[in-house]
Amino acid sequence: MADLISYDDAIDAAYDIFLEMAPDNLEPVDVILFTAQFDDRGAAELVDISDDWAGHVGFDVDKEIYAEVRIGLVNEENDVLDDVFARMLISRDPDQKFCHILWKRD
């Protein structure tokens, strides 16, 4: 197996994919909100991989090879990322590129 990409690089890749795909997968109002408030409240955070991913992707997720990134807006009062626009599962193996996104739905 190849060397895994760093968690920082996984976050960067997830954010780039999010920006490219958000206009086609989020409500227009959410795209406007995220764009307008990202500089002040936006975040792309690495989190512990949730156990529900196997049900979404159809295979057992190796928590050493994959990373979960959440992208959204942080609540200014408690500094918690609580307005999540996308949950992303991304492979850190450069030879096995994979990304699955769960988008915010109203």
Curated annotation (Swiss-Prot):
It comes from the Bacteria. It holds the Pfam family DUF440. Belongs to the putative dsDNA mimic protein family. It comes from Vibrio vulnificus (strain CMCP6). HAMAP family: Put_dsDNA_mimic. May act as a double-stranded DNA (dsDNA) mimic. Probably regulates the activity of a dsDNA-binding protein. This is Putative double-stranded DNA mimic protein VV1_3059.
